[in-house]
Amino acid sequence: MATINQLVRKPRVKKVVKSNVPALQACPQKRGVCTRVYTTTPKKPNSALRKVCRIRLTNGFEVTSYIGGEGHNLQEHSVVLIRGGRVKDLPGVRYHTVRGALDCAGVKDRKQGRSKYGVKRPKA
C-alpha cells in the first residue's frame, strides 16, 4: 500500500485498454466498399478455403473481413456492413461482414441459426 506522500509524488497510472477492433472507432458496425473478394487458407492445423474480402470503410480504414455462411454474392464494389469479431485461424482478420445487410445477401436455404446469417423466417 502506497503512502499518501508517494501518491502525491507519483499518482497511480490507469491501465490503457487497447481495442481489438480499432477500425470501428467505438461504433457497433461500419459501412464499406469491397475492394477485393478472395479466398485464403487458415493456419495449421486447419485446412479450408475461407472466404474473405478487403474493405475500404467510410472512415478511410482498409480492413480484411470474413464472409460467414455457405455461398455469398459479394464482388468488387459491393457495399457491405462489418462488425467486430475475429477469425481465430485467419491471422489479420478481425472483422465479420453482416449477412443480409446492404449488398450482402443472406445465406440461401438456411433453416437454423438464421438471425446470424440474415435469413427471414420461412413460410410454414
Swiss-Prot record:
GO terms under biological process: translation
Disulfide bonds: none
InterPro entries reported in the protein's UniProt record: NA-bd_OB-fold, Ribosomal_uS12, Ribosomal_uS12_bac
GO cellular component: small ribosomal subunit
Modified residue annotations for 3-methylthioaspartic acid: 89
GO molecular function terms noted in the UniProt entry: rRNA binding; structural constituent of ribosome; tRNA binding
Keyword field: Methylation, Ribonucleoprotein, Ribosomal protein, RNA-binding, rRNA-binding, tRNA-binding
Function text: With S4 and S5 plays an important role in translational accuracy.
Family: Belongs to the universal ribosomal protein uS12 family.
Subunit organization: Part of the 30S ribosomal subunit. Contacts proteins S8 and S17. May interact with IF1 in the 30S initiation complex.
Protein known as: Small ribosomal subunit protein uS12
UniProt lineage: Bacteria, Pseudomonadati, Pseudomonadota, Gammaproteobacteria, Pasteurellales
